């Protein structure tokens, strides 16, 4: 595999100084990290209990009080009752554990989704501050495409620490987003500015910002990188950049005024959650050999006072960006790097510096449209699609992943189908 060389912030070191309190960076959001850990633990534990509980229930299926005993265990360990019809005939035939497993996954997902929308545990609807900041930086929409790999499912709420409600997120395998769909979304946003003044008026000097997050592995770069690009991070970055440029060209060809579109490319280490950002120059061009590496910024600034650390982050971003880079883009990148410092410390504190599951460990496949409730790493593999035919490539990748995770153990592949519809359009629900 050919690995790209990166001219990042390697020239400076932390100078051997002692780390800050508890070894955390001075800009780390300690309260935020604690809240995110509680949520991650609660949700993943709910899914990970399913197999041990079903093993326990399976061993009891020929006892005289099996149904009552099984329900008691499920209620205590999983928090819900099992379908009675799945248990009633266990004394005659073997308990259908594959079917019961799938049902438990779906019920656990439903409970998680209900809690997410009812209680907003991640504070993702607190969007006003970010909306104002983005517009101050010169952007009226942040549209992010991470790879569909489940190891990037937490990219918005955890890795970048952005409120999910302020970001359009639509993952695709390899980060290869649908250009036509994105142009359509761009047109929808611009029409909203023109007709409604949302999020700002059409004459405001702001742009639509399209971002792609590609990924790589620092632990096992030859095998645990992006499967869609053969674990070649240089190929992943180039393919993402090519897709971004195709989007901009499409807007310019169809509507002229390419200045209304801005582009940004981010790399993410799926073992540490550290990001590297390829800052564009004033014309929107990005050099894949040039980036700002958050994990190196962390080392350089972790022993400073908070105000000094924030200023130094901004200096490092500017120093390692093209001279003609837009000031608003530099502000945004500095904020993303600063936010990522908290996630670097989160992985160090909670997961020992690197995730134990370097590869895939998704619990189910999410197929369709939507899924803003999925904000956790390695919980879901995404296959965004309107029809099976157009999403065949993403579905094939998901089938391969779950062939190793589930099918090899005799378990089915749980698939949650989700489709959002416009409630104001007559008949939309029935068509969905």
Q: How should these model regions be labeled?
A:
Residues 3-141, 149, 175-209, 217-432:
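Divalent-metal-activated hydrolytic enzyme cores
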Residues 214:
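Conserved beta-strand-loop-short alpha-helix elements that form
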């Amino acid at each position: 595999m050919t690995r790209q060389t990166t001219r990042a912030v390697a020239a400076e070191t932390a100078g051997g100084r002692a780390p800050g309190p508890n070894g955390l960076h001075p800009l780390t959001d300690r309260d935020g990290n604690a809240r995110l850990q509680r949520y991650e633990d609660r949700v993943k534990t709910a899914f990970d209990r399913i197999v041990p509980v079903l093993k326990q229930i399976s061993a009891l299926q020929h006892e005289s009080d099996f149904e009552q005993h099984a329900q008691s265990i499920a209620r205590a360990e999983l928090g819900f009752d099992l379908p009675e019809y799945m248990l009633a005939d266990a004394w005659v035939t073997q308990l259908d554990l594959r079917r019961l497993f799938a049902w438990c996954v779906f019920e656990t997902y439903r409970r998680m989704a209900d809690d997410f929308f009812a209680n907003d545990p991640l504070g993702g609807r607190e969007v006003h501050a970010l909306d104002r900041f983005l517009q101050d930086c010169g952007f009226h929409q942040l549209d992010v495409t991470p790879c569909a790999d489940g190891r990037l499912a937490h990219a918005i709420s955890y890795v970048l620490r952005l409120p999910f409600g302020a970001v359009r997120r639509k993952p695709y395998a390899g980060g290869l987003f649908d250009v036509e769909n994105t142009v359509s979304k761009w047109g929808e946003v611009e029409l909203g500015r023109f007709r409604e003044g949302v999020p700002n008026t059409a004459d405001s000097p702001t742009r639509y910002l399209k971002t792609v997050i590609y990924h790589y592995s620092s632990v096992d770069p030859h095998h645990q990188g992006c499967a869609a690009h053969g674990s070649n991070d240089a190929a992943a970055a180039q393919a993402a950049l090519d897709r971004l440029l195709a989007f901009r060209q499409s807007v310019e060809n169809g509507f002229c005024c390419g200045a209304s579109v801005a582009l940004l490319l981010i790399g993410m280490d799926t073992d540490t959650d550290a990001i590297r950002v390829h800052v564009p120059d004033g014309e929107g061009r990005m050099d894949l050999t040039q980036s700002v590496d958050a994990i190196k910024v962390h080392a350089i600034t972790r022993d400073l006072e908070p105000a000094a650390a924030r200023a130094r982050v901004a200096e490092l971003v500017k120093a390692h960006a093209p001279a003609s880079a837009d000031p608003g883009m530099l502000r945004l990148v500095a904020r993303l790097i600063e936010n990522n410092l908290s996630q670097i410390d989160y992985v160090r504190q909670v997961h020992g510096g690197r995730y134990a599951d370097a590869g895939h460990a998704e619990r189910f496949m999410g197929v369709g449209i939507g899924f803003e409730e999925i904000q956790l790493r390695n919980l879901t593999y995404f296959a965004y699609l309107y029809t099976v035919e157009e999403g065949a490539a993403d579905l094939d990748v998901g089938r391969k992943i779950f062939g190793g995770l589930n099918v090899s153990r005799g378990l089915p592949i749980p698939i949650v189908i989700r489709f959002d519809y416009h409630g104001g359009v007559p008949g939309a629900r029935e068509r969905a």
